[in-house]
């Protein structure tokens, strides 16, 4: 978010693109979770996975580095919550397709690295 450049939409951010991918894939696996989890882990993981990209987008729209950083930190918390739910789903073997949940856990780790890099970038911009 360089002040000298033209405005970039949040949908152009690589970290948002990855978080959107996570949200969509979580929505797909939720269809395969047992009914008894409908009001427990399904609601929780849908909410937390949606919150990642939503917080990145909201922070981006604030135009102040410190606010953007704070929303990215909230996104990071939601990302870890999503990862925790995925570990639970994996450990209970709710999803039978080999590697599908593991792939989402790896995607969470990839997003976290990107998000940490984006936060570091925003902190640097704030100092300049």
What is each of the regions a protein language model found here?
Residues 1-128:
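Amphipathic alpha-helical assembly/interaction segments
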């Amino acid at each position: 978010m360089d002040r000298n450049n033209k405005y970039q939409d949040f949908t152009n951010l690589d970290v948002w693109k990855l978080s959107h991918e996570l949200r969509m894939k979580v929505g797909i696996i939720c269809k395969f979770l047992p009914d008894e989890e409908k009001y427990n882990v399904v609601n929780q993981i849908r909410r937390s996975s949606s919150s990642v990209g939503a917080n990145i987008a909201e922070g981006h729209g604030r135009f102040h580095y410190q606010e953007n950083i704070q929303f990215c930190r909230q996104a990071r918390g939601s990302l870890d919550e999503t990862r925790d739910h995925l570990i639970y789903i994996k450990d209970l073997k709710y999803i039978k397709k080999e590697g599908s949940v593991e792939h989402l856990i790896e995607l969470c780790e990839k997003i976290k690295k990107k998000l940490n890099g984006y936060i570091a970038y925003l902190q640097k911009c704030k100092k300049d």
